[in-house]
Amino acid sequence: MRPQATLTVLPVERPLVGRVSPPGSKSITNRALLLAGLAKGTSRLTGALKSDDTRVMSEALRLMGVQVDEPDDSTFVVTSSGHWQAPQQALFLGNAGTATRFLTAALANFEGDFVVDGDEYMRKRPIGPLVDALQRMGVEVSAPSGCPPVAIKGKGGLEAGRIEIDGNLSSQYVSALLMAGACGKGPVEVALTGSEIGARGYVDLTLAAMQAFGAEVQAIGETAWKVSATGYRATDFHIEPDASAATYLWAAQALTEGDIDLGVASDAFTQPDALASQIIASFPNMPAVIDGSQMQDAIPTLAVLAAFNRQPVRFVGIANLRVKECDRISALSHGLCAIAPGLAVEEGDDLLVHANPALAGTTVDALIDTHSDHRIAMCFALAGLKIAGIRILDPDCVGKTYPGYWDALASLGVRVQR
């Protein structure tokens, strides 16, 4: 059933000025939670994100016998024996793609029958390529629909060997195999195929986290890695702020000619979405073509910003956005066209945004269907900073990765109506 709650962001009359601390990185937090759960001993994760996605990951670990304590709102203390027990119930992971993909592979290293499941949205998101790769490694795993639920019969460890997976597919599949590989029965080589490597920066995040937890990974050229069966060591690990969350604040600053201090320089991030900061800094002269393949979670932000640019912007390399929390290409196109007919058009898997700076200061009657996708809600709030009458459906879906988003905007002087 379509959620009925709506939120309207009231246009601002002055530049947004202030300091906002973005939450911890979702991508890094869920990697760190998984690795801490696989390690023997106690790990302290600081700067962590507390949100729907990290909650379902931590709850899944608890169900399997891992102790996860939360002494404050940005810390997890994870104590594990390094051995997980199969729970009596399915592991419910909501719509968390990272948790679902990462756990599916990791569970092959333990004894017992496991089921990984999610909500109605997760049950439409593909996991078949990861299941196929695990089957080729000898894992007894199935997902009849090609999407969750996934049934895994663990036999105590991945077999040593080489596994190939298409690099054009989700980087989460690659990361899942790499992280699981360190707990196998012998060395595992993960090799990418395909003409392009999608979202390579997220693979680099995975490798850095693995090495921080004691894994030994050897690069074999640019597209393959050999993971030794060392397991993981408990450690203290600090998580940087979320670059995807930062993009909304960078864009809000650009749109209002403001000055928002995030407490961290844009070039200090290791996450690939931080690349968007350079494009946002070029506003209102964003480039005519933007390749989103290496910063996919930043594309919703950039697409809404492009509506106010001085020239049209074509987004390419974004096909994977169709299988995120929703079909984000379609959601962006429909949302922009709700603001102004013809403002955006889908051309294959490209998104063309017809810039119209004159939209600023106008009033429209636009209901934005977020499809309960946090990034659609957050990016269209940016349009509301300049255009009156934009109503956002299901605004609380931002809790997936940025529960404090509306409060952050309010701290800068943005007013909203519910």
Curated annotation (Swiss-Prot):
Catalytic activity: 3-phosphoshikimate + phosphoenolpyruvate = 5-O-(1-carboxyvinyl)-3-phosphoshikimate + phosphate
Gene3D superfamilies (UniProt xref): Enolpyruvate transferase domain
Binding site for 3-phosphoshikimate: 26-27, 31, 170-172, 297, 320, 324
One Gene Ontology term, aspect cellular component: cytoplasm
Residues bound to phosphoenolpyruvate: 26, 97, 125, 172, 328, 375, 400
Domain of life the protein comes from: Bacteria
InterPro entries, alphabetized: Enolpyruvate_Tfrase_dom, Enolpyruvate_Tfrase_sf, EPSP_synthase, EPSP_synthase_CS, RNA3'P_cycl/enolpyr_Trfase_a/b
Entry EC number(s): 2.5.1.19
Pfam families: EPSP_synthase
Active-site residues per Swiss-Prot or TrEMBL entry: 297
GO biological process, one term: amino acid biosynthetic process
Keyword Transferase applies: yes
Molecular-function annotations in GO: 3-phosphoshikimate 1-carboxyvinyltransferase activity
Pathway in which the depicted protein is active: Metabolic intermediate biosynthesis; chorismate biosynthesis; chorismate from D-erythrose 4-phosphate and phosphoenolpyruvate: step 6/7
Keywords, comma-separated and alphabetical: Amino-acid biosynthesis, Aromatic amino acid biosynthesis, Cytoplasm, Transferase
Subcellular location: Cytoplasm
Assembly with partners or alone: Monomer.
Functional summary from the UniProt entry: Catalyzes the transfer of the enolpyruvyl moiety of phosphoenolpyruvate (PEP) to the 5-hydroxyl of shikimate-3-phosphate (S3P) to produce enolpyruvyl shikimate-3-phosphate and inorganic phosphate.
Protein family membership: Belongs to the EPSP synthase family.
Protein name: 3-phosphoshikimate 1-carboxyvinyltransferase
Organism listed in the record: Pseudomonas savastanoi pv. phaseolicola (strain 1448A / Race 6) (Pseudomonas syringae pv. phaseolicola (strain 1448A / Race 6))
